[in-house]
């Protein structure tokens, strides 16, 4: 796989609280320069990213219910609508992990369905936070996402105790079939990214995108 091909797997990511406007501008410039698929940013920076990415092919991805996923469903749906109105091309929502742990699967499904409906055709990725789930819970969550028809299931927020693993990516891919799988959290080098892709990932979320496509080591990135 060429570096240009690998770049098209990457959502170039900046989600930590201290990221400022200059950081987001730099992120957008890097995404254009290296041909990344998208930038993944908090929704307050969508207007800035829209301005910086004008005329390019780089998409704007934003997060909803991030990073805990425990917001009211109505709030998630409203956040989704407002983000799309502002210019988001893709939505990454966080599933309600507490409801999964409470076996409230109907509520889990309704939560995702509400955001999916709010997307109104905009691609939706559902973040499972796999490090907090059992294998059975991962499978059940993936089955719900497949039934609803979301665009992707995603491993992690990158804000918890663990990120993507090859094992979890393979399990998710085997469960969802043709739906996309996004590996995120802890993917910081070429070898790891390629292992995730081999396991079934069709998108990589990373703040170390430049290191991933260039084959260098990134010791600074946190996502």
Swiss-Prot record:
The keyword Manganese does not apply. Its EC number is 4.1.2.4. It comes from the Bacteria. Gene3D superfamilies: Aldolase class I. It catalyses: 2-deoxy-D-ribose 5-phosphate = D-glyceraldehyde 3-phosphate + acetaldehyde. InterPro entries: Aldolase_TIM, DeoC, DeoC/FbaB/LacD_aldolase, DeoC_typeI. One of its GO terms (biological process) is deoxyribonucleotide catabolic process. Pfam families: DeoC (PF01791). Keywords: Cytoplasm, Lyase, Schiff base. GO terms for cellular component: cytoplasm. The keyword Transferase does not apply. It is found in: Cytoplasm. One of its GO terms (molecular function) is deoxyribose-phosphate aldolase activity. Pathway: Carbohydrate degradation; 2-deoxy-D-ribose 1-phosphate degradation; D-glyceraldehyde 3-phosphate and acetaldehyde from 2-deoxy-alpha-D-ribose 1-phosphate: step 2/2. The active site is at residues 92, 154, 182. Catalyzes a reversible aldol reaction between acetaldehyde and D-glyceraldehyde 3-phosphate to generate 2-deoxy-D-ribose 5-phosphate. Belongs to the DeoC/FbaB aldolase family. DeoC type 1 subfamily. This is Deoxyribose-phosphate aldolase. It comes from Haemophilus influenzae (strain ATCC 51907 / DSM 11121 / KW20 / Rd). The gene is deoC.
